[in-house]
């Protein structure tokens, strides 16, 4: 079978390797025929050598849809012929976060495409506890969007109650676009999405995000003032992964507000911690998704 291996930064090899066999499956394993793969922004970071937690060589691909080829004897969640996706986290199931259901921050977490091989190959074996059967009628293309949608759903939950709040999303790539849509769906009063790319901002507008701002042309402070007036904004999502982005969010957001860091930063930003403390800003991290947000993603994509 074909397999794409990121051997080192900027070096992908396409190899012919032996395909896994149904006869070799363990009782809780599922053999998949990969049909669609999304290219995540984090994987682009890995390709360029600026992702802080990529172990080379590695097979990329963690946003995907597939058809079940065969299952182990104890598998009940799916059967041959089912169209599925799967969560990419490999968790221990034993540590304190896992026991709380927060396997996304497992003490021994490995993520396929970064610390373990992913789905950029014709056939792939996964454990059944990570399988999710796609709803009837959902296309393979949409199925590959489940994982990034789940990431966005989880990120907005990390921002707390957004109902009635003004929200800024910095970064209008795929995840930023989805975060903005979820913020809107969760009752935000107004959602402003920013980027330096007019192309990305146009896509956001086509997806229903009315208020956009190119911060390469108009500073965030000016654009936010124009949109929100004296109300300021009370929640922000950093999805660009650059120092200037999070610094401007900190400097412009209302006192006592929340900033959620969604992006993977290639370099640690230099931040004014005195300013952060003086303004009682809350900075929350977010890591992929959990079962609830993965389920929410299925419902959201099906609504599309």
Task: Label each PLM-derived region with a short phrase.
Residues 92-170:
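NAD(P)H dinucleotide-binding glycine-rich loop of Rossmann-like/cofactor-binding domains
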Residues 197, 265, 289:
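Residues in the short beta-alpha loop(s) of Rossmann-like NAD(P)-binding domains
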Residues 87, 123, 144, 172, ...:
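Glycine- and other small-residue-rich loops at beta-strand/loop junctions that grip anionic moieties
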Residues 22-37, 50-96, 130, 135-137:
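Glycine-rich beta-strand-centered segment in the early N-terminal region that forms part
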Residues 293-300:
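Conserved small/polar residues in nucleotide/adenosyl-binding loops
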Residues 159-163, 202-282:
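Glycine-rich cofactor phosphate-binding loops and adjacent beta1-alpha1 units
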């Amino acid at each position: 079978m074909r397999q794409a291996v990121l051997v080192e930064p900027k070096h992908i090899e396409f190899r012919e390797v032996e395909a896994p066999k149904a006869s070799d499956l363990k009782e809780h394993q599922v053999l998949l025929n990969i049909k669609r793969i999304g290219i995540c922004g984090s994987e682009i970071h890995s390709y360029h050598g600026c992702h802080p937690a990529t172990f080379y060589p590695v097979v990329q691909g963690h946003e995907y849809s597939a058809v079940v080829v065969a299952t182990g004897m104890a598998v009940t969640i799916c059967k041959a012929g089912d169209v599925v996706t799967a969560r990419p986290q490999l968790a221990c199931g034993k540590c304190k976060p896992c026991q709380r259901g927060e396997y996304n921050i497992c003490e021994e977490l490995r993520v396929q495409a970064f610390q373990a091989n992913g789905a950029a190959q014709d056939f792939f074996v996964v454990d059944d506890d990570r399988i999710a059967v796609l709803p009837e009628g959902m296309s393979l293309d949409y199925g590959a969007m489940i994982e990034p949608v789940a990431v966005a759903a989880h990120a907005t939950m990390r921002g707390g109650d957004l109902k009635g709040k003004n929200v800024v999303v910095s970064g209008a790539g795929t995840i930023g676009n989805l975060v903005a849509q979820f913020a809107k769906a969760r009752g935000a009063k107004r959602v402003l999405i920013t980027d330096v790319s007019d192309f990305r901002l146009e896509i956001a507008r086509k997806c229903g995000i009315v208020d956009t701002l190119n911060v390469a042309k108009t500073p965030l402070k000016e654009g936010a003032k124009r949109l929100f007036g004296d109300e300021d904004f009370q929640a922000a999502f950093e999805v660009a992964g650059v120092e200037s982005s999070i610094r401007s969010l900190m400097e412009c957001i209302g006192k006592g507000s929340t900033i959620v860091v969604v992006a993977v930063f290639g370099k640690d930003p230099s931040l004014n911690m005195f300013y952060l403390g003086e303004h009682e800003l809350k900075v929350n991290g977010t890591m992929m998704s959990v079962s609830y947000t993965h389920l929410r993603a299925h419902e959201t994509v099906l609504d599309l």
